[in-house]
A protein has these predicted regions:
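Short, solvent-exposed loop/linker segments at the N-terminal edge
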Residues: 4-9
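Short proline/glycine-enriched turn/loop motifs at strand-loop junctions of beta-rich domains
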Residues: 19-23, 113-116
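Conserved aromatic anchor
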Residues: 10-21
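Recognizes extended acidic, P/S/T-rich segments that occur
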Residues: 24-60, 68-81
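Histidine-/acidic-rich catalytic cores in large beta-rich domains
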Residues: 68-71, 76-239
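Residue-level signature of extracellular beta-strand-rich folds
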Residues: 1, 14-16, 27, 51
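Hydrophobic loop/turn residues within beta-sheet-rich immunoglobulin-like superfamily modules
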Residues: 19, 53-57, 183
Length: 239
């Protein structure tokens, strides 16, 4: 892999099967099936290669691997495979760096709410590395991602960096987008919308603003819709 996929990342993991008697592998990637313009041309002793520097958004990529033997000769190319990289979707960021030497290496993951919902990963310079249209609200210590997946109609759960659903709440069970977590016992917990009813607007610095809109805003009159949430725990297996 990857094979016949549209990726949402410019950091690409390549994997292939081990070849008999190979001591190394030569991997090439190109924007052409003729491989006359190479993104990468590198050797590795492993059957995986992570490329972080060669690709950009909206690239079309053909790639292939061949074994290298102990006498230095090359084997035949393994089947040529193809994938594409999708578009950037995060809103533009302005990153101000005051002292580059104080910035730790690593990536930052966050969710944006405007101008549309999206989550993504950026490097320390603000460059977009990975994105999804899902609403992410929690990452645990092992890097597992939780939130509201864009394909599950407001249901919540766990998904991976390949956009695959690992677990979701049952059909017809939307969640509050602010929080869903997996508990130490393996179960999942989140807030779900429970009831909407009219209630009072409590008095405060905002009172005059609500009164200007026609509300009594006296702390007594039931006139404003309030949403009640229910805290639910789901069994990992039976939901």
């Amino acid at each position: 892999k990857p094979d016949s996929a549209t990726l949402r990342t410019i950091h690409v993991l390549f994997e292939w099967e081990q070849e008999p008697d190979a001591v190394e592998y030569n991997i090439q990637a190109s924007n052409s099936i003729s491989f006359n313009n190479l993104y990468i041309n590198t050797n590795t002793e492993n059957t995986v290669h992570i490329e972080k520097n060669a690709f950009n958004w909206e690239n079309n990529v053909y790639w292939r691997v061949r074994p290298i033997y102990s006498d230095g000769s090359n084997g035949e190319w393994i089947d040529t495979r193809y994938f594409s990289i999708g578009e950037r979707i995060l809103a533009d960021l302005n990153v101000d760096i005051y002292d580059d030497g104080l910035i730790e290496d690593g990536l930052v993951m966050y969710t944006q709410f405007a101008p549309y919902i999206a989550s993504g990963v950026i490097d320390k310079y603000g460059n977009e590395i990975w994105n999804t249209q899902s609403w992410m609200n929690h990452i645990n210590e092992f890097g597992q991602v939780y939130g509201r997946h864009f394909e599950t109609e407001h249901r919540g759960g766990q998904f991976n960096y390949d956009q695959d659903e690992i677990w979701t709440t049952p059909d017809g069970t939307p969640i509050d987008a602010h929080e869903i977590k997996q508990l130490p016992n393996g179960n999942y917990m989140a807030f779900t919308p429970d009831v909407i009813r009219l209630g009072p607007i409590h008095e405060g610095p905002w009172t005059s603003q609500f009164q200007a809109l026609g509300y009594a805003a006296d702390g007594i009159t039931n006139e404003f819709p309030w949403l009640g949430l229910r805290l639910v725990e789901w069994d990992e297996e039976t939901r």
